[in-house]
Amino acid sequence: MTTEKKTMNISEIQELLPHRYPFLLIDRVIDFQEEKYLHAIKNVSVNEPQFTGHFPQLPVFPGVLILEAMAQATGLLAFKSFGAPTENELYYFASVDGAKFRKPVVPGDQMIIEVEFLKERRGIAAFKGVAKVDGEVVCSAELKCARREF
């Protein structure tokens, strides 16, 4: 029995997330299941603006942006699980706990972002997230996002 994967292209991602270049950090969703998990891709290019200063001689993708990519993935999963945003609504990145950075991410890498839904209460959703490159975990954390009007 084959299970068809649910995906999202960049247009579908932009319908749910307010982020745009250079801060939209999810390129494609390769699989998700509402209220369960979401797997997404972030292609890391040397042409991204952060590499002019982090670091010019040895470019390393900033860890805080890996966490932001995971946070964006949680927002996508939350909207897919609990309904699309209204015109004045979005998911804010509320907290991160236990972040661990295990290996540098460099231009040319393709990060696979995996977030797993844990629970939701009063508009705050909790997730476990990992980022992988070539099957190896480069970052892990627990994240929360809060659905709010702006």
From Swiss-Prot:
Q: Which CDD domains match?
A: FabZ
The molecular function GO annotations come to: (3R)-hydroxyacyl-[acyl-carrier-protein] dehydratase activity
Q: Where in the cell is it found?
A: Cytoplasm
Q: Name one GO biological process term.
A: lipid A biosynthetic process
**SUPFAM superfamilies for the chain:** Thioesterase/thiol ester dehydrase-isomerase
On whether Cytoplasm is a keyword of this UniProt record, the answer is yes
Q: Name one GO cellular component term.
A: membrane
Catalytic reaction equation(s): a (3R)-hydroxyacyl-[ACP] = a (2E)-enoyl-[ACP] + H2O
Q: Which InterPro entries match?
A: FabA_FabZ, FabZ, HotDog_dom_sf
The enzyme class is lyase
Q: Which family does it belong to?
A: Belongs to the thioester dehydratase family. FabZ subfamily.
- Annotated function: Involved in unsaturated fatty acids biosynthesis. Catalyzes the dehydration of short chain beta-hydroxyacyl-ACPs and long chain saturated and unsaturated beta-hydroxyacyl-ACPs.
What name appears for this protein in its UniProt entry? 3-hydroxyacyl-[acyl-carrier-protein] dehydratase FabZ
